[in-house]
């Protein structure tokens, strides 16, 4: 604020938590400090923080101040902290195990130091953010046998129920800005359950498919490296685990998804290296998708059929979200359809470590593109028949996770009754090109 005043700024819009239930992290402290600085931009911020904490937490102020400082150390450059971004998930790197352990210890000290129930309740409310981070981390899904599920599903459900009950006691209506807590509870009840998986495996890859999760492939495990080529979605994300992986989506055009959902089932007759899925679209179209392992490659063949009595405009998109490791060493390589060679550097100094691009016509890849980590490891390779592809999309982020997403869209066509649209794509590993 002092900088703004020096440059002649006469007014500022200061935004705090807007949910009617209140309860946002440090909302009272933030409002107090902002109000004081609006009156006097030269006020000592640390003194203001101490004033508020001592008045609000009494004898528990000292451990609460220690928690305040611990949180800030996670992102201060001089303390080896990480950059903080808007909409960071609970899995953000600055909310690591060491930080959580320190926070738990300080909140225990604060609760013990509280001189009465009113102060103890304030400490308990302040701890809800840490409780939520730990709760979402416990929600992480893994494959065990034929199931994709959290490790302790029953315990997780009990913890979630208790957490929601505490929110209600404090009158808190929002966990995050985008949705109300009641909707988050609905999503938890809907999505957090076991999902049966089908597994394909050869001597190079192991692939897990979850038909009930949009027919998506959740894992393509490179057995030589012992790692999943796909970026695993963050458990704090909305609608988790129905996110990410490798999936195909029907569109009415290149922007608008077809209305409703597609219900997928695993077809009979799967083998150890091949399986097929059938998807029933809500508008009556049908998708047939075959997945087959061939050495270091997962080959996919997808057919969208108009099974309705009327013409339907349709397109398909096949996308995989990859995790190639540290994006500062990652490039995307491909040859354009006009013959030009491209090596796209994803992370550049002094620029936001995220972005997206769309390619069509002569600019799009000529049937193959690769994600290469220059620090080592196999290339992540996607191939497709260029005559089937109308557009390609690339997006990446290194904010709170390392993720590179590559999507191929089919031609958009008006399908007459009984007509079909095909999109093939292969995904796997290869040797890095010089």
Task: Report residues per predicted region.
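Histidine/acidic-residue-rich catalytic or RNA/ligand-binding cores of hydrolases
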Residues: 22-32
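Beta-strand-rich recognition/accessory modules
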Residues: 193-205, 212-214, 222-233, 272-282, ...
